[in-house]
Design a protein with these regions (language model features):
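Structural boundary/hinge residues at secondary-structure and domain interfaces
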Residues: 2-162, 207-264, 269-364, 381-394, ...
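Charged, amphipathic alpha-helical scaffolding segments
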Residues: 6, 13-15, 171-191, 263-289, ...
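Short, surface-exposed beta-strand/loop micro-motifs that present aromatic residues
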Residues: 33, 104-109, 162, 168-176, ...
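A conserved glycine-rich beta-strand in the N-terminal activation segment of trypsin-fold
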Residues: 164, 168-240, 415-499, 585
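Loop/turn-rich, solvent-exposed surfaces of beta-rich toroidal or solenoidal domains
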Residues: 364-375
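Flexible, glycine/threonine-enriched loop-and-boundary segments that flank and lead into catalytic domains
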Residues: 400-417
């Protein structure tokens, strides 16, 4: 009987111990990333679930395009020139095995220009299994550096392993199922305290900060990556710098960063598309003004790019004049010399800027248009004439047709022949690269319908995002790629025939057919609005507008560097750059 009683007691103790350990481990594993960080954290980036993000990436449109057999066949030659390494593939396999969740890296402070970082992730499996992979990474990172001083410290039941040199420290520790890394041993101890719920100050956590809570409430629950930035540290440094030089801004004035309470961004996959969201917590800058997209009436079925945004140039004439002077031009100084003030500009023009790019199928290059509403035709004409006088050669010619004033100028010979033209009516100013497109656009501005607005492609794309209040952009990737292929494919074939460097890099005969590419493409749309207490900027497409802009900049820099290395000329192009949405100053 005693043996049975003893056995029951032992089982009860074991069950209680197992339950307690399970509860403790669940409490640790359920700790949010924000709950692990100090309240004054400046920046944190997070990937909630690496394997889920990778799986969704492999099902998105742009990855499916990359996996097309024809695309792989075309890329085989250029990729063959790149040194092969298995390190990246092995690292991805290791990460997949760890199955990291809530992976994060955070900038917690900048003291004496010494940034401090912490990071970590929730791993799958046992600590010993994780250490086999992480230990390998640690060895590669540390290498055979003889100046490294390694030490192990016991702290609250955890082993902190630190590697130190005279200039930096890297501390790592396990708190299963978490692995943590920090650039300061004291920060590592604080991180472990928060993970184990031992922190004496429960309010000193990022998730207790009101600005952070407001920002992350705008973040979708199904994102694959996100970040949060607290600009206060930078605005305080700017204020200190102003005080040091004796500069005091007037009440209500200040830089954009001083007006921002917080910034957060996220990315998710949505029906094969990439969807970015950016939130800027700050006061509204535009008063009683909203985007009308009135320039949409100029669009045609051949329009592949459309932009509308609020841009109050009248408020920024002094800044623009300083920038122009720095660039070596006196375009805005001419307005001042002519007695034209910022008030005159605001009276002459509306604040909604529009831009369109059309590419007819029978044209080798696109035509670009820029539009501004006219509210006072007389003042607008005075401003235009004053600006044109800034041209030193004075080669602009003026004509009038059907009540519209046209100003045009023949540019010097270049890779793409252009004739800058400005049309001014009592309702709108249109600037373009050739007289024909400007005149046709002026005719369309008098109508009430738009081929672009009526197209199903545009309608479907525009409805993917909430209605904008101060920024909207649309880019038809199918039409753009089709036109680029028709114009550049013959040039690429010719270049490969006469330029050995091109022939050695790619095989243009294996360039995929346009339909192989375009079946994976769809329009890119970007929309920005003021929502409650900040600006919400969203973009969706096979890639987003910001990603397109960053990619184009990287590609251009690499292309220019390669051309300089090989002694090739890099012709200028007339393609529009991807704009970045920002609040209207």
């Amino acid at each position: 009987m005693k043996r049975i009683l003893f056995l029951l007691i032992a089982l009860a103790v074991a069950a209680f111990g197992g339950w307690y350990y399970w509860q403790f481990s669940q409490r640790i594993s359920s700790a949010t990333v924000a709950g692990l960080l100090p309240r004054e954290t400046i920046f944190v980036a997070q990937i909630p679930d690496f394997n889920r993000a990778r799986d969704e990436w492999e099902h998105c449109d742009i990855y499916q395009l990359y996996r097309e057999p024809a695309v792989q066949d075309f890329l085989r030659k250029p990729l063959g020139n790149v040194p092969k390494t298995d390190a990246v593939s092995q690292t991805l396999l290791d990460i997949e095995q760890l199955a990291p969740k809530n992976a994060f890296v955070a900038l917690t402070s900048i003291e004496n220009n010494n940034p401090k970082f912490v990071g970590g992730f929730h791993f799958q499996g046992k600590q010993e299994e994780a250490e086999r992979i992480i230990g390998k990474w640690r060895s590669v990172l540390m290498g055979q550096n003889s100046s490294l001083k390694r030490e192990k410290v016991q702290y609250q039941g955890h082993e902190i392993e630190a590697a130190k040199t005279a200039s930096f420290t890297i501390a790592t520790a396990y708190d299963p199922p978490w692995f943590f890394v920090a650039t300061d041993a004291a920060d590592m101890q604080a991180l472990l305290d928060r993970a184990d719920r031992r922190s004496s100050d429960s309010n000193n956590r990022l998730d207790k900060d009101e600005a952070y809570r407001s920002a992350v409430s705008r973040r979708p629950s199904n994102d694959v990556a996100s970040f949060y930035l607290q600009p206060k540290a930078f605005s305080q440094r700017l204020a200190a710098l102003r005080a040091a030089v004796g500069s005091t801004p007037a009440p209500g004035e200040g830089t954009m960063i001083e007006k921002m309470r917080c910034i957060t961004g996220s990315m998710r996959f949505e029906n094969g598309k990439i969807h970015d969201v950016l939130f800027l917590g700050m006061p509204k800058l535009e008063q009683n003004t909203t985007l009308t997209r009135s320039s949409l009436s100029l669009g045609t079925k051949e329009t592949f790019f459309y932009l509308a945004m609020l841009l109050n140039l009248g408020e920024r004439m002094d800044t623009l004049n300083q920038a122009a002077a720095f660039a070596g031009t006196k375009i805005f100084q001419t307005l001042s010399d002519s007695g034209i003030t910022a008030a005159d500009w605001k009276a002459a023009f509306g604040i909604e800027l529009g831009s369109l790019a059309n590419w007819p199928s029978d044209s080798h290059w696109p035509s670009l248009l820029v539009t501004v509403p006219v509210t006072d035709a007389t003042k607008a004409q005075q401003i235009v004439e004053a600006l044109l006088k800034a041209e030193e050669d004075g080669s602009w010619t003026a004509t009038e047709k059907n009540g519209v004033r046209y100003f045009s100028k023949q540019s010097a010979a270049s890779f793409v022949a252009i004739t800058p033209t400005i049309a001014l009516s009592d309702r709108i100013l249109i600037a373009g690269l050739d007289p024909a497109s400007v005149e046709e656009s002026m005719k369309r501005s008098r109508g009430n319908s738009s081929e672009l607005a009526d197209s199903q492609t545009y309608k479907a794309a525009a409805h993917l995002l909430p209605a904008p209040t101060n920024f909207f952009a649309y880019l038809d990737m199918v039409q753009l790629y089709s036109r680029l292929d028709a114009s550049l494919r013959p040039m690429l074939l010719m270049a490969a025939a006469f330029v050995p460097a091109v022939a050695g890099s790619i095989d243009p005969t294996k360039l995929p057919a346009p339909e192989v590419i375009t079946k994976h493409l769809s329009p890119i749309v970007s929309s920005q609005r003021y929502d409650g207490d900040g600006y919400m900027a969203e973009s969706i497409g096979p890639i987003t507008l910001d990603q397109l802009g960053i990619g184009a900049a990287i590609f251009s820099s690499f292309g220019a560097a390669a051309a300089r290395h090989r002694g090739l000329a890099v012709p200028a192009t007339a393609f529009p750059q991807a704009p970045h949405p920002s609040p209207t100053p």
